[in-house]
Amino acid sequence: MSKNIVLKRIVVLCVALVVGVFGVKAQSSAPLVESSDSDLQARFRVALEIPLAEKLKLTWSEQLRTKESFSQLDKMLTAFTLDYSPWRHLGFEGEYVFVNERKGDELWKVKHRFNLAVIGKLSVGRFDLSLRERVRWVVRGYETDEYVTPNPFTTLRTRLKADYRNDSRWKPYVYAELYTTLNAPAAVENRFSCDVERDNYINRLRLCVGSTMKINSHNSMDFYYMVHFNRSQGASYDELTGNLSSRTLKKVCAHVIGIDYKFKL
């Protein structure tokens, strides 16, 4: 990936941060119901990296996520990631994630995530820059209302990351990531008489600062802090008539503390 392409993507990312995160499309005359919330969350992950070939590796990881100020278990994730780096400046990634998500006090629901990514890499001085474009498909293992929740739900994730190389065991990094919906449900006037319509908008901005600590050639840890600015649009319909009763905009600011451990074979 050339330096000009990386710079263009940086400009696009900055523009999107300014104009795309807070805007809401005018969709109908139905009232807009807005809500906002904040939360403290934590993530703990252990991973095993297995080299398959010179430029190919497989990573198996298990992760726990908490929410509600660390008081509730939110998700349990099992992931298998295949990483292929045929060239110095370009790599590819495929991933499957089994998600067990808590809904309510005792109800757990299953989701399947499928990720495909292209990663461009560029070194500038002591900084290693990378631009990752990832498409994610989320398949829910339960029945959904297509006017409210598409299944699968598709998003595009754009991440710009900078790692700082130095002679110590610590390798600090920062990154910004945008989530863009590709098939979010759009509000329709009547769910009984109108076809399903799709919309796309930026529904999350993620900012992260952290550092990887190399323990030895086989063991490493990662410590990070992230802040998520989430915004999701939705719609409510009258159960009897199917008429659009309101549009919803939910905003959540989540502060996330994470600790990862990885063992390399």
Q: At which residue positions do the language-model features occur?
A:
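Residues that define the transmembrane beta-barrel architecture of outer-membrane proteins
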Residues: S38-A42, D74-M76, V110-F114, P150-L156, ...
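Bacterial Sec-dependent N-terminal signal peptides
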Residues: M1-P31, L265
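Outer-membrane beta-barrel "beta-signal"
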Residues: N115-V118, M213-S217, K251-L265
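Membrane-embedded beta-strands of outer-membrane beta-barrel proteins
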Residues: V46, A79-F80, L116-V118, T158-L160, ...
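Outer-membrane beta-barrel transmembrane domain signature
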Residues: E133-L240, F263-L265
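Transmembrane beta-strand segments that form the barrel wall of outer-membrane beta-barrel proteins
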Residues: S28-E34, L56-F70, K75, G91-R102, ...
